[in-house]
């Protein structure tokens, strides 16, 4: 069995990597990938904590987090496809300009 500290450290490293990708990247697709990494890191923390205390709640939360991440990814990718068709660019700077 993996110790609690090792699992939580791995989850924290993954969360920081996802946050770094979210903050540094200017492409919306890479920002979405960074957000998915952050969601998976938090789900990993739930699983590690649940297995440490012998409770199935962590696995239930993991299933919930994965289903929410799948819904978020599908909606995000659909919006990105529409944005790419209209602007031919996924740069966050070009998207932030409003018409009107």
Curated annotation (Swiss-Prot):
Gene Ontology molecular functions: NADH:ubiquinone reductase (non-electrogenic) activity; quinone binding
Catalysed reactions, semicolon-separated: a quinone + NADH + 5 H(+)(in) = a quinol + NAD(+) + 4 H(+)(out)
Pfam families linked: Oxidored_q2 (PF00420)
Keyword Mitochondrion among UniProt keywords: no
Gene Ontology annotations of biological process type: ATP synthesis coupled electron transport
UniProt keyword terms in alphabetical order: Cell inner membrane, Cell membrane, Membrane, NAD, Quinone, Translocase, Transmembrane, Transmembrane helix, Transport, Ubiquinone
A GO CC term assigned to this protein in UniProt: NADH dehydrogenase complex
EC id: 7.1.1.-
Main location: membrane
Subcellular location: Cell inner membrane
Catalytic EC class: translocase
Transmembrane segments: 4-24, 28-48, 60-80
InterPro entries from the UniProt entry: NADH_UbQ_OxRdtase_chain4L/K (IPR001133), NUOK/Mnh_C1-like (IPR039428)
Topology term for the membrane: Multi-pass membrane protein
HAMAP family in the record: NDH1_NuoK
Family label: Belongs to the complex I subunit 4L family.
Assembly: NDH-1 is composed of 13 different subunits. Subunits NuoA, H, J, K, L, M, N constitute the membrane sector of the complex.
Function: NDH-1 shuttles electrons from NADH, via FMN and iron-sulfur (Fe-S) centers, to quinones in the respiratory chain. The immediate electron acceptor for the enzyme in this species is believed to be ubiquinone. Couples the redox reaction to proton translocation (for every two electrons transferred, four hydrogen ions are translocated across the cytoplasmic membrane), and thus conserves the redox energy in a proton gradient.
NCBIfam families for this protein: PRK05715.1-1, PRK05715.1-2
UniProt protein name: NADH-quinone oxidoreductase subunit K
Species, as recorded: Enterobacter sp. (strain 638)
